[in-house]
């Protein structure tokens, strides 16, 4: 299927679009992560970015993609409440891989938000959703528009949570192609790749964190906990970036 034809999927009605996406997802399911990335870089629209939280295992997708497209813009959404270790990790990886890092954040500073709304993360699911919208969803939407993004690479995996278990390799959201190259990777495969390529993990991994977001809504992974329960007090898994 040619790049020209794929770009024009957005012009089709929903039924035809879904049929083509189903065919492409079947194709991608037989590819390795490296092959999916190569295919996407060649066949999907060329205004391409990847997003990264610079979390526990973020190095894997960064490494896979920059081997093939070193200058790809890497979008980071900075809430202002990341762990100090995360900010240091961002600096370290940016220097190590010469990342084309693009940082976006809310137009309202964290201090001003607290003055205006209080600690939203302490106000139940509605407060958390409002917080995520201000600090993550709105900045990401601005980034996608500012960079005229057509193709978005992300590192979501099926085994990270129930909400991600049925995600496809390729989807179209608001006219943007979204590709998930390591969707079918297991935790063991992630660990093996990190070890084989001598890659760094987030500094908090050795302190018992399996997932890292904001300081106030992230817990250590305790025995018996699901990974998704370490975020947002177990009330939800997604921050909103990958829900719509």
UniProtKB/Swiss-Prot annotation:
Reactions catalysed according to its record: [thioredoxin]-disulfide + sulfite + adenosine 3',5'-bisphosphate + 2 H(+) = [thioredoxin]-dithiol + 3'-phosphoadenylyl sulfate
Biological process, per Gene Ontology: hydrogen sulfide biosynthetic process; sulfate assimilation, phosphoadenylyl sulfate reduction by phosphoadenylyl-sulfate reductase (thioredoxin)
Main location: cytoplasm
InterPro entries recorded: PAPS/APS_Rdtase (IPR004511), PAPS_reduct_dom (IPR002500), PAPS_reductase_CysH (IPR011800), Rossmann-like_a/b/a_fold (IPR014729)
Top EC class for this record: oxidoreductase
Documented EC number(s): 1.8.4.8
GO cellular component annotations of the record: cytoplasm
Active site (record annotation): 239 (nucleophile)
GO molecular-function terms, A-Z: phosphoadenylyl-sulfate reductase (thioredoxin) activity
Pathway: Sulfur metabolism; hydrogen sulfide biosynthesis; sulfite from sulfate: step 3/3
Matching NCBIfam families: cysH (TIGR00434), PAPS_reductase (TIGR02057), PRK02090.1 (NF002537)
Membership in a protein family: Belongs to the PAPS reductase family. CysH subfamily.
Protein name (Swiss-Prot/TrEMBL): Phosphoadenosine 5'-phosphosulfate reductase
Taxonomic source organism: Buchnera aphidicola subsp. Acyrthosiphon pisum (strain 5A)
Lineage start: Bacteria, Pseudomonadati, Pseudomonadota, Gammaproteobacteria, Enterobacterales
